[in-house]
Amino acid sequence: MANVVVIGAQWGDEGKGKITDLLSRSADVVVRYQGGVNAGHTIVVDDRVLKLHLIPSGILYPETICLIGSGTVVDPKVMLGELDMLIANDIDISGLQLASTAHVTMPYHRLLDLAMEKQRGDRRIGTTGRGIGPTYADKSQRSGIRVIDLLDEARLRERLEGPLQEKNQLLETIYGVEPLDAETVIKEYLGYGKRLAPHVVECTQAIHQAARARKNILFEGAQGTLLDLDHGTYPYVTSSNPVSGGACIGAGVGPTLIDRVIGVAKAYTTRVGEGPFPTELSGRLNDQLTERGGEFGTTTGRRRRCGWFDGVIGRYAVQVNGLDCLAVTKLDVLDELDAIQVCVAYELDGERIEHFPSSAEDFARCNPLFETLPGWQCSTEDCRKLEDLPDAAMAYLRFLADLMEVPIAIVSLGASRDQTIVVEDPIHGPKRALLSA
């Protein structure tokens, strides 16, 4: 039995969905522990492309329990849309569970998110506009609506009365937005609650029951380390904690229940939205990575910013998350390049630094210091074993493992499930990986 956390080691969009899908084959329970519909993951199954935002990737396995944990924020309309999509694709949803204590994104959260971002102008953060920040803000202010409130009309009315009056006043007087009608909102969200009720459970009880039965539990994070509210490139961050420690809070478990932590990183780096990005590319190389990598957001459709692999933020992710091993994705995107650069340090105010600065302003002034490695200029998409990889590709992976000081357990070479090299089974194998410097 092993309980594993999967996190993003960059700015999100690292390919966690595919890796979680792969590991879900060996998991009895998959837990999504933070975030909301601002994150998305794409899974390719038998030529079908399934895009999910809230529901864990493990839903594709009929015997797997998929739990949306207390640390998430749930947009019930989006969630029900995903459920309908899965049903239309003949996927069994009976294993889906939703924490009764997860907070709910209400219509005023989305309106406020869009209005506040518009008002910021040039100081915009790059929010997805899905209401995630305002939902977490209400949670912190103890005025939020939780899933359990959608199951009882009297409780929902009581919980909603004050917040809705306050939000309507804000929307009207500050942002010039039409107020929401209380009865319309109550009717709509009671309807959502009725449909979701069969899936609602007590999160902590469900997880600890599985742990007592010695089940394999997989904790799935959304976004990435550099978007963490406390440890990311603040203020260009999300409103929750995608790092591995967030799994304990968002799922309601102690750290002793976690056996290992797997980080997922692309073979290069991408970022969506605003904020510093030292290794960002422009021109032909940027376009090449964007097109070959399909770098458009699952949630927003926005074009992702592309750059070389950044070993400084990689080492930082290893430290913050306590990574045991790494899954490297999209190695195939680099197949056509004759030379590949990797950032090994920064230059800030004339000094070489090898750490991630805590100030976004300092980070924006960092210049990347690169080492250049030879490309392999041949396809890796059909490689299924390490020995199938070109020598230069192997050298590149070993360089990344050495730079980040963590072994590589999985290499992904395309979107399909079979386009994967599993160096070491992170769940059933020994606590090590074979591909290291």
Swiss-Prot record:
Positions bound to substrate: 298-304
Record family assignment: Belongs to the adenylosuccinate synthetase family.
Q: Which GO terms describe its biological process?
A: 'de novo' AMP biosynthetic process; IMP metabolic process
Q: Describe the function of this protein.
A: Plays an important role in the de novo pathway of purine nucleotide biosynthesis. Catalyzes the first committed step in the biosynthesis of AMP from IMP.
Protein location: Cytoplasm
* Residues reported to bind Mg(2+): 13, 40
Q: Where mainly located?
A: cytoplasm
Which InterPro entries does the UniProt entry name for this protein?
Adenylosuccin_syn_GTP-bd (IPR018220), Adenylosuccin_syn_Lys_AS (IPR033128), Adenylosuccinate_synth_dom1 (IPR042109), Adenylosuccinate_synth_dom2 (IPR042110), Adenylosuccinate_synth_dom3 (IPR042111), Adenylosuccinate_synthetase (IPR001114), P-loop_NTPase (IPR027417)
User: Which CDD domains does UniProt cross-reference here?
Assistant: AdSS
Q: Which organism is it from?
A: Parasynechococcus marenigrum (strain WH8102)
Subunit notes for this chain? Homodimer.
Report which reactions are catalysed by this protein: IMP + L-aspartate + GTP = N(6)-(1,2-dicarboxyethyl)-AMP + GDP + phosphate + 2 H(+)
Q: In which pathway does it act?
A: Purine metabolism; AMP biosynthesis via de novo pathway; AMP from IMP: step 1/2
**Name of this chain's protein:** Adenylosuccinate synthetase
List the gene name: purA
* GO MF term list: adenylosuccinate synthase activity; GTP binding; magnesium ion binding
**Could you name the Gene Ontology cellular component terms for this entry?**
cytoplasm
Cofactor binding summary note? Binds 1 Mg(2+) ion per subunit.
